[in-house]
Amino acid sequence: MGSGTSTQHHFAFQNAERAFKAAALIQRWYRRYVARLEMRRRCTWSIFQSIEYAGQQDQVKLHDFFSYLMDHFIPSSHNDRDFLTRIFTEDRFAQDSEMKKCSDYESIEVPDSYTGPRLSFPLLPDHATALVEAFRLKQQLHARYVLNLLYETKKHLVQLPNINRVSTCYSEEITVCGDLHGQLDDLIFIFYKNGLPSPERSYVFNGDFVDRGKDSVEILMILFAFMLVYPKEFHLNRGNHEDHMVNLRYGFTKEVMNKYKVHGKEILRTLQDVFCWLPLATLIDEKVLILHGGVSDITDLELLDKIERSKIVSTMRCKTRQKSEKQMEEKRRANQKSSAQGPIPWFLPESRSLPSSPLRLGSYKAQKTSRSSSIPCSGSLDGRELSRQVRSSVELELERCRQQAGLLVTGEKEEPSRSASEADSEAGELRKPTQEEWRQVVDILWSDPMAQEGCKANTIRGGGCYFGPDVTQQLLQKYNMQFLIRSHECKPEGYEFCHNRKVLTIFSASNYYEVGSNRGAYVKLGPALTPHIVQYQANKVTHTLTMRQRISRVEESALRALREKLFAHSSDLLSEFKKHDADKVGLITLSDWAAAVESVLHLGLPWRMLRPQLVNSSADNMLEYKSWLKNLAKEQLSRENIQSSLLETLYRNRSNLETIFRIIDSDHSGFISLDEFRQTWKLFSSHMNIDITDDCICDLARSIDFNKDGHIDINEFLEAFRLVEKSCPEGDASECPQATNAKDSGCSSPGAH
């Protein structure tokens, strides 16, 4: 008996030991599996973020380029000054005129066939709820109601301070939501899960309502409607995408014009004014600061509270180059003597030609001719006559135009015929934000937190700063606050704490990069101000996918975008690969491949980890780079029936070209008029120190107008660019037939191809 019992215990112990080892082995395998998935997820995330931030850098550089052209362009007529004012300056007079025009929304008829939601003011809760339901059913709000709602929204916003103060004493809880970026499903899901706004349920939406998603208009209408219904319980902060210059690139401008073709221009101009009246921050119980981006080491809440926020129409520029008339005159004379000796910003090459990126104009060159041959309609003036007019003119209308074009500063000598009160009134209206005020706003809208101490420029985004835990702690102590809530960054889980839990990032657009890429989140605060975070994914497809399927789907999308990026820089990559191929055998090591790719793309990605997904493995760890580039081209050409070199150029420049098109199309008509083209080309030719006749510019415009309807649309604009690239495959104007002809004829035309 004893022996049998002992044997049974021995076998039981062996079985238990074997089971324990098996469990440990399975656990080790599973942990490795999860670790590999996590590594893939992080690499995928890095790809999406790097490409997104690279696009933001391009936008900033492109706008800096146009701003530089404006600063060094000498207007030769009233038309040129007005054109600059329309495109580049913050035209308060035009906006006020447009608002008066929009107040006449009653003149817009709503047809009997219209089946969408109807609004009457003052709005009631049922109106706002009906809007949510109508947009859920894919109905569209009529332009009359859109303009009416925007007009009422502006009337409400102008009464609000720069920093809203709200309290948890008057509601059970306050819900803070982050970026929505035009994703209506997320907003509807938040209201479904958390409840519609009410006196007991307050909301703060922390900016970036628009761009990228397809339902930005609908989101704005819902948010504005609830803000009018519950002005004390529903609050909005401005984000960096509530900016008409940013909207030109990221889709909102295009969305409005597609949905409201007749009244789209009025809606966009009104929205531009509404955006600049949005509050900059919200303070809960004087303890929790909510702003879109972050803070910096110079953030001053007292100064932010006093800024005339409506003057900062766009954070992409600061029109505070306050120079005296004498300084402006000296600048004009210097430019007239030799524009080639003028200062060249960091984003332009040493030669005075336009850079190959973001814009290549190929061979649009012409023989230098006199400005006196301008067409009569331009009313051209030489530089000396313009200077004389700037010095001597005392007419109010001319002064206003010069103010808007940035040629004078407020506070100069007033005309004798005007009273001091009138002058002060006009000065207040035309006052531009100072550099300090502008930077305060840029920092709170564009900045990101970092783990290191200190504060440094945000070179990744191209605007704002990176702020460390010490900067956060300093601000919280200065104003006796507990923590800071910000948005601005997509997070895998929809939220993230940092800086010892003193900074909370909330991002409410789920599936932002791709279905399954990230969760959305919002945070609820009660009287104790303890953050309660709720996560979600609005897309039902994600609930049916396993973790591996979800990561694989997102990874595939990210790698596809990365291959497009690599293909767009094929020529640059080939040149860089050749530097590592000293023996000219067409082979480089995989380590050299990774170094070369990073030196060209500057994305900061873990290329060695991504290599297996991008490069076929080889036994000797060598890569035949020409065949690899050829395979990249085949992958893209399978989707596009365009020559490889031309497709590469379009992939690299399309976003910038579309943005340039919308900048030139200052009236948002969807077309560039011949006059807009002429004036813009004079801007370029002035920068490149090329005198070109207006007749030649008009011939060029007509040649781009392929269908001869008197306007240039986006397809014609891109096609002209493609043809120029086709005739100049290496971007060398000297090898282009057009450049040769230009020397003889004084103008060039893509239509000749």
Curated annotation (Swiss-Prot):
Broad EC category: hydrolase
Region described as Disordered: spans on this chain: 318-382, 409-435, 732-753
Primary location recorded for the protein, binned into one broad class: cytoplasm
Organism, as annotated: Homo sapiens
Protein name: Serine/threonine-protein phosphatase with EF-hands 2
Gene Ontology MF annotations: calcium ion binding; Hsp70 protein binding; Hsp90 protein binding; iron ion binding; manganese ion binding; mitogen-activated protein kinase kinase kinase binding; protein serine/threonine kinase inhibitor activity; protein serine/threonine phosphatase activity
Highest taxon, organism lineage: Eukaryota
Domain IQ, residue spans: 21-46
Biased composition (Polar residues): 366-377, 737-753
Function description: May play a role in phototransduction. May dephosphorylate photoactivated rhodopsin. May function as a calcium sensing regulator of ionic currents, energy production or synaptic transmission.
Tissue-by-tissue expression: Retinal specific.
Family listed: Belongs to the PPP phosphatase family.
Encoding gene per record: PPEF2
Binding note for cofactor: Binds 2 manganese ions per subunit.
Binding site for Ca(2+) 1: D665, D667, S669, E676
CDD domains linked to this entry: EFh, IQCD, MPP_RdgC
Compositional bias annotation for Basic and acidic residues: 322-333
Required cofactor(s): Mn(2+)
Keywords noted in UniProt: Calcium, Cell projection, Cilium, Cytoplasm, Hydrolase, Manganese, Metal-binding, Protein phosphatase, Repeat, Sensory transduction, Vision
Catalytic activity: O-phospho-L-seryl-[protein] + H2O = L-seryl-[protein] + phosphate; O-phospho-L-threonyl-[protein] + H2O = L-threonyl-[protein] + phosphate
InterPro entries cross-referenced by the UniProt entry: Calcineurin-like_PHP_ApaH, EF-hand-dom_pair, EF_Hand_1_Ca_BS, EF_hand_dom, Metallo-depent_PP-like, PPP_dom, PPP_phosphatase, Ser/Thr-Pase_EF-hand_contain
Regulation: Activated by calcium.
Binding residues for Ca(2+) 2: D705, N707, D709, H711, E716
UniProt-annotated stretches for the region Catalytic: 128-540
